[in-house]
Amino acid sequence: MNLPNIPENDSQPRHLSDLVVDYLELLGVEYVFGVPGGHIAPLYEALERSECRGGPRAILSRQESGAAFMADGYARETGKIGVCCSTTGPGATNLITGIASSYSDHVPILAITGQTILPKFGVGAFQESSPDVLDTTSMLNKCTRYNSVVTHPKQLENKLIAALKSAFQSPPGPVHLSVPVDVFRSPAPETISYPHIRQLLTKPAFADLAAIEKLGQMLEKLSSQNRKVVLLVGEDCGEASSEILAFAELMGAEITTTQGGKSCINPYHPLYKGVFGFAGHQSARQALTDSSVDLILAVGTTLGQWATSTWDRALLNERLVHIHHVNSYFSRSSMGQLQVYGNIKTVFQELVKRMKSSLLVGKVSQKEGALEDPNSKEKPPQIEVQKPESYYSQETPIKPQRLIYEMMQRFPAETRFLIDTGNCMVWSFHYLFLPHPENYRSSVELAAMGWAIGGSVGTAFGRPNTPVVCLTGDGSFLMNGQEITVAVAEKLPVIFIVLNDRSYGMVKQRHRQVVKEGLEFAIPTVDFCLMAQAMGANGYTIRKPEDFDKVDYCLLYTSDAADEKGRVG
């Protein structure tokens, strides 16, 4: 088999770095995000050659963690593997937070780091991070699905394939290869050994049929007694959303979600009652604690602190059935009746098939199961939010609830929303509702500040000509805001909304709740509008609701990055 798009008259010598890029091209990967350096230079040279023939190209981030966040955003948007790279030493260590974030959120990314030449391992070479010295590979052991140093040129292809396969296994996640610069420059074969690599990355559709049979019997008994089942949908349910909704409609089961699961269920479905747990809705808690509920199906959730409302017995009790494709999480549901291990889509396909054969009709009629308004930009009527009147507040400084409302009103349905860590998450969990829930993205496990900034850039690369909104805080922006220059340079339609309360607000509020003392955790006054303009973006300051009319929203369709600063009270 000829390598991807290589001209037949190309007499330039091929290196193993070219082989890596060839595999990325076979997988449809368009970009590699990273910061260059001497020990990773051969990969950049290969990407330059690739770009000239229309293949994958390099995107230069401003810091390596930003590159990892971009790869994460690209992977979430496209379903492909996200790829990031760095040089050895500090370049590799800067990647760690981004890699750990993807590990916690089950996002497949390939991280490639350069390394000192093999003969100089252990002798103190510049920025050496081999297993004999700093050992960045060991640092990444606990946040990767595959992690290896390539110590011979003949290892590279097989280790690359092993890494790619591991990235898409259950659970998916980041993988890492540390490649010495002399290995990268070694001669490459003219053909590749795994031309059908896509087939090797197919996710297995496995399921514990015995556990499904037992759950089916429990559901049939419950239905015959007119007792209820309620669902808690977690962050790992995206591929099974339609099957879960079909099951819920068949059973008449109300649906709640975790914070991450918010992206899996349309909030305008009449059975949806909102988010349970941290920053959630009272209507969701009422659904779970209803005395007529005999089973709670917790699906695709890690049952962590936020998702369980700090391990609340309202959820974690003997009514619980835990369904997940990662069996290590079952240690968190020992109080429940049953654990069902398997591909979530497969599990619910089997449950729907079984319940259709045992029930004469579904509990929810077609009319009742229809969306309240598939194009609505208002709060879903069946979800109870705190102070709903704050959506329309005219106060100055502008209230976060009003900002969220304006976001719902002003951006088109296809807009992607990436929500950063901090109070941004709190407001979005509770007040932001999208008729296309899959367009809502957050990172709720590691919850690294600044994830959404790099992630929004990667998302924009993955979905050209589609508006992307990043909601972030002033603290996060000061950590990672330099990545806006990538959006500017590439003319990406991204709008960065900065909640400016001049403090690490979430930390300050939590500290006051616990300690009752007034530590401010203050951030000095920064003019983010001027900061954005200095980086080449359009900048707007939003102090009152009328200021939203100053923003040129046409920029989202002309591939010009924008920055919008909101000072919130």
Regions found by a protein language model. Give the residues of each.
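Active-site flanking residues adjacent to catalytic metal/cofactor-binding acidic residues
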Residues: 299, 323, 419, 473-474, ...
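Thiamine diphosphate
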Residues: 112, 120-131, 292, 331-333, ...
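Conserved short loop/turn motifs at secondary-structure junctions
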Residues: 233-239, 392, 473-475
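Beta-strand->loop->alpha-helix junctions that form or flank phosphate-binding loops
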Residues: 254-260, 422, 542-546
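Active-site diphosphate/adenylate-binding microenvironment
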Residues: 17-20, 25-27, 38, 43-48, ...
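N-terminal alpha/beta PP-like core and its mobile active-site loop of ThDP/TPP-dependent enzymes
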Residues: 2-358, 413, 486, 493-496, ...
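Intrinsically disordered, low-complexity polyampholyte segments enriched for Lys and acidic residues
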Residues: 363, 367, 564-565
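Long, charged amphipathic helices and adjacent flexible linkers at domain junctions
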Residues: 198-206, 367-396
